[in-house]
Amino acid sequence: MNAGGLASNGRQFKNPDEMWREEVGDQSKKSEWYNKGVSYWQGVEATVDGVLGGYGHVNDADIKASEAFLNALLAERFTNAGRGHHLVALDCGSGVGRVTKNLLIRYFNEVDLLEPVSHFLEAARGNLAPENLLVSDSYKAANFYCLPLQDFTPDAQRYDCIWIQWCIGHLADDDFVSFFKRAKGGLKPGGFFVLKENIARAGFVLDEEDKSVTRSDSYFKELFNQCGLHIWKMKDQKGFPDELFAVKMYALTTEIPKIVNPSKTRRQSKNRPGVIK
């Protein structure tokens, strides 16, 4: 990826390699990068508004779009849209359990939560206690892992879905690729990843305060290729305030999506109307 980028302090970079050399060029710098990221979030209150950076009011629009995306995936990937299956999900960067409570636990019998900030995870335990959930006893938060993504290896073939939202920007490129390569082993046959993230218009934007990087769509696609992952489906998030970064949802699989017969597509098309942070 040769596109340049910008830091929140105004510093310009020719390409990601230049930025990563400066930020995580040796093990000491890399440790400092990750420690600063966790330290930033340790100073944030364990509420939905806190983990959403003061934008707690976007929660409803976020969950609504994510649910539509997930429903389409379940219908495409599993017989009977997964009903009758014992489905298991992993919520990465789970924070206070916002995505699990509002979405995942209504579709997956078990949800594991992965979060490096201990007071967020403790809040999630409370938020996801059985007495605080409006779901049957067959749906539950199963395991709570207080670990960062770069240190986590999932159990083999445990998950039908690994959901990663608003946290992958904390990983350096090499750890991004390593994480997904390990995590692929945690997917069941037919399983998939959902990555939901802020998107830079071009190149990347480095946030010096919380030590994270907002990548462009093309930057992500290059990393997906390095991970050996394929885009099954993607969709833009709608309904967020204009001042926020654009947000995309990517469904990623280890197998190449089947290509629709192009001649059939052409015949059908003739019958259609011609219609930041």
Task: List the model feature ranges, each with a label.
Residues 167:
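Hydrophobic adenine-recognition pocket in adenosine-nucleotide-binding enzymes
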Residues 1-157, 171-182, 189-277:
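Class I (Rossmann-like) S-adenosyl-L-methionine-dependent methyltransferase catalytic domain
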Residues 163:
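A conserved beta-strand element that flanks and buttresses the S-adenosyl-L-methionine
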